[in-house]
Structures are given as structure tokens and as C-alpha cells.
Amino acid sequence: MLKIFNTLTSTKEIFTPIKKNRVNLYVCGVTVYDFCHIGHGRTFVVFDMIVRYLRFSGFQVKYVRNITDIDDKIISKSTKEKKKINTFTASMIKEMHKDFDLLGISVPDEEPRVTDYIDNIIRIITTLIKKKHAYIHKNGDVIFSIDSDPNYGTLSRQSLTSLESGSRIPLNNMKKNPLDFILWKSSNKEEYSWDSPWGKGRPGWHIECTAITNVFFNNSIDIHGGGSDLLFPHHENERSQSICFNNKSMINFWMHTGMVILNNKKMSKSLGNVYFLRNILKDCDAEVLRYFFLSTHYRHPIYYCEKNLDQAYTSLKYLYTALYDTNPFFNNEEGLNFELEFYNAMNDDFNTPAVFSIFFKIARKINFLKNKDILKTNKFAFRLKYLANNLGFLFQDPKEFLQKKTTLNLLTLKEIQLLIEKRNIARQSKLWQEADNIRKKLMSLDIILEDLPDKTIWRKNKKS
């Protein structure tokens, strides 16, 4: 019996699809103004895992992940690069697919682009105005009134009073409430504006998902997902306008992935600590990164550092070592008890850390049987590969994986630490040239040192 943590109720609930054996799943996709970063990777690997498991469990899944191909950042970036918006977004979507393919993220059933659904967006906004959930500003903007929804703040568990007290109202503010948000943004520039009853303009961010989910799911969604950074205001606003448009809640479960933490800080462009997937994957095997993403429960923050990446590599190396020199390609009933444990872990809100511990138990069994019982060894090897494949793992040839270099490429963790210790000794002895030479050697290998009062820490230079 599958249980999923529902953000709306803040509890684990038994998952019962709206239609028997069918799951409608929607995930907020990428705004394609730049390359995909590690936060995108974490979220979409998680939902790829969820879709794979639901299908493995016998559900027919309709998976839709949108693409935002019009917004202020896209306009700014395309202008800067002197490209037409359509040309720019097409190239960024292509790059997004390259990154996701490397990570083994399956293509969703539908990947709608916002600009293909402008008519649907206008229709919904028109209805919201008629129902007095939205108002038109004199400049042509259409704005959603959060005061028209008495349940606003329910999803993110925030009261209107506390939200309003934390907002600052600018002079000449065009909104009735500072938390009101744009549904339609007035714009007269031809390349990124469309005709509407309120004049030329383009859609606001939040209305996009409401329009697309209405088109593809006919007001009926089992699971809506995204990163926890989208919970407020994006998902709160989306839910509010969707309920006001449809006169009911159309989403049963809300799921959110935890943040990626870098050097004890949330990843953020403003902090200058955004790591692009393609830069990380230059010297990290894609399956290692995928394993890293799922080694922490999807709802929890995940701490990105070389040590944790190296740990993911070591874990995968152990599993591939168990599969090495086996023939796991025939079905059998050996190890079904492990499969039951696998189901129990996955049915507990997709508990992948527990699943990985089960994989290790099977691997230990294989290692124990090697050179003792070839037939049983191969049977358990099948069970390990069969279960792991269904989550997107262990597709590589074991020999090829084991011959690859580690995630650090040229240096092991131990070698790096030895060099740092040697440099510390040189500094204590005031051998500044020797210490500087070691720093330069590490820098040439993209190892960045940071001297603290009591120790020296290091990181791999994978910044954008």
C-alpha cells in the first residue's frame, strides 16, 4: 500500500488514484533562460524515479512536465545574446534535453511549451475577471486578487495576516493587496506579446501551470510536484487561481523536493553558487550523480560536496563489483524476499535510502555466493539488476564502470588530503614558496583551497 507525504495536509497519506490504476502526474518544469543546474537535476531525477516506480507497480502514468519559454529572464537573456526569443528558447530546450538524457531522466509523456497555450491562458483569465477574482489595471495588467480566495495560504500553511505584515507596499502600488499577483503583463513589444481583450501582453508565471493542467488533465490531477522553492508563492498562487477558476480543488497530492545545500548555503544565483549540471558531469559519472540525488530522502535537503559525491561513487562501485563476472540476464524467483523489502521501502513515501540498503544486502549475498554457487550467484545478480534498473540504475557494463576514474578524476580524496597536510606543514615552517606551489598544483586540477583559522577546507571548482 503506497503512502505519500502530502504537502497540503503535512501528513503521509494512502495513495488512491482518482481513476483506478491511472495516475495523472504534473511537475513544474524549467524556465529555459540558462543551462540546467544541480537543483533542476535533483528535482527531475526524483520525479523520474517516482514515475518509474509507479509504472513498475502497475499504474498507467500520464506524466506532464511543462516548459516556460517566455518570461522576463528569457527576454533579457535573448536580448543580451542578440537572438530571437524562439531561436534562443529552442536552443536552450535542446541543451536541457542533453543534460537530462545524461542523467537518465526519461522524457515525459507531454512537454508543453507555454507559448502554445496563450489562448487557453486568456480564456482562464477572462473567467477569473468575470468571477471577480481578478481586476484590470489601467496600464493593461490583469491582477489576481488574493482577498477573493478565503483559503489563500492553505498549501504553504501561512495566514493572510502574517503574509501581509511581512510585505512592503511601494508608493503608487497598482495592486489592491501587495500579495496580489500578475496574470497578464502588458507589453507592446511584438516579439513577445500577444493580443488579448486587455491589450497586447504576455502571461504571468503562475497562470501558465493552471492553463496547462486544465488542458492535459481536465481538472483531475493525482500528484502535482516541484521543488520546495516553488511552494510559495508559485504553487500557492497556482492552487488559488485554479480553485477559483474550477470551483473546486483539482489536485489530490502536492509533493515537494528538498533544497540543494552548497557550503551550508542554499543554492542561489544571487549568492553566486549555482552549479550547472554539464560542468559537474565533466568529471562525475552521470549515474554517480543520480545515485547522490537519491541517497537522501527526496523531501530532505541534500548537501552537495565532493565527499558526498565520492561516497556515491564508492556505493555504486560496490554494487557493480558484485555484478562483475555474473550473468544476471534470466528471470527467476530467487531473492523475492528482497523484492518485498524493496516494495515496502518504496511504498513508504519513496524511501530510496532504505532501498539502497536493500541493494547492498543483495550485493553482499552475491559476494558470499561467488565461487561457491554460480547458479545462485546469477539468480541474485538478476534480482539486484532487475530492481535497480527500475529506478534507473545499474545499466552500465560492470567492467566498464569499474575501469572509470573516480568522481575526482586525477586525484583521490586521500591524495588531496595528503597534499593539504604537506602544505600545512610547509606553512607552519614558513616555507611559503613550497606551500604556494602545492596550492598552484591543486588549482591546476580545479581544487580550490580555503584557509580557515583552525583548518584548510577544499572544494572542486565546478561553478558556472
UniProtKB/Swiss-Prot annotation:
<feature type="binding site">
    <location>
        <position position="209"/>
    </location>
    <ligand>
        <name>Zn(2+)</name>
    </ligand>
</feature>
<feature type="short sequence motif" description="'HIGH' region">
    <location>
        <begin position="30"/>
        <end position="40"/>
    </location>
</feature>
<dbReference type="InterPro" id="IPR009080">
    <property type="entry name" value="tRNAsynth_Ia_anticodon-bd"/>
</dbReference>
<dbReference type="GO" id="GO:0005829">
    <property type="term" value="C:cytosol"/>
</dbReference>
<dbReference type="GO" id="GO:0005524">
    <property type="term" value="F:ATP binding"/>
</dbReference>
<comment type="subunit">
    <text>Monomer.</text>
</comment>
<dbReference type="Pfam" id="PF09190">
    <property type="entry name" value="DALR_2"/>
</dbReference>
<keyword id="KW-0648">Protein biosynthesis</keyword>
<protein>
    <recommendedName>
        <fullName>Cysteine--tRNA ligase</fullName>
        <ecNumber>6.1.1.16</ecNumber>
    </recommendedName>
</protein>
<feature type="short sequence motif" description="'KMSKS' region">
    <location>
        <begin position="266"/>
        <end position="270"/>
    </location>
</feature>
<keyword id="KW-0067">ATP-binding</keyword>
<dbReference type="InterPro" id="IPR024909">
    <property type="entry name" value="Cys-tRNA/MSH_ligase"/>
</dbReference>
<dbReference type="InterPro" id="IPR014729">
    <property type="entry name" value="Rossmann-like_a/b/a_fold"/>
</dbReference>
<dbReference type="InterPro" id="IPR015273">
    <property type="entry name" value="Cys-tRNA-synt_Ia_DALR"/>
</dbReference>
<feature type="binding site">
    <location>
        <position position="269"/>
    </location>
    <ligand>
        <name>ATP</name>
    </ligand>
</feature>
<keyword id="KW-0030">Aminoacyl-tRNA synthetase</keyword>
<dbReference type="GO" id="GO:0006423">
    <property type="term" value="P:cysteinyl-tRNA aminoacylation"/>
</dbReference>
<feature type="binding site">
    <location>
        <position position="28"/>
    </location>
    <ligand>
        <name>Zn(2+)</name>
    </ligand>
</feature>
<dbReference type="InterPro" id="IPR015803">
    <property type="entry name" value="Cys-tRNA-ligase"/>
</dbReference>
<dbReference type="Pfam" id="PF01406">
    <property type="entry name" value="tRNA-synt_1e"/>
</dbReference>
<feature type="binding site">
    <location>
        <position position="238"/>
    </location>
    <ligand>
        <name>Zn(2+)</name>
    </ligand>
</feature>
<keyword id="KW-0862">Zinc</keyword>
<comment type="similarity">
    <text>Belongs to the class-I aminoacyl-tRNA synthetase family.</text>
</comment>
<keyword id="KW-0436">Ligase</keyword>
<feature type="binding site">
    <location>
        <position position="234"/>
    </location>
    <ligand>
        <name>Zn(2+)</name>
    </ligand>
</feature>
<dbReference type="GO" id="GO:0008270">
    <property type="term" value="F:zinc ion binding"/>
</dbReference>
<keyword id="KW-0547">Nucleotide-binding</keyword>
<keyword id="KW-0963">Cytoplasm</keyword>
<dbReference type="InterPro" id="IPR032678">
    <property type="entry name" value="tRNA-synt_1_cat_dom"/>
</dbReference>
<dbReference type="GO" id="GO:0004817">
    <property type="term" value="F:cysteine-tRNA ligase activity"/>
</dbReference>
<keyword id="KW-0479">Metal-binding</keyword>
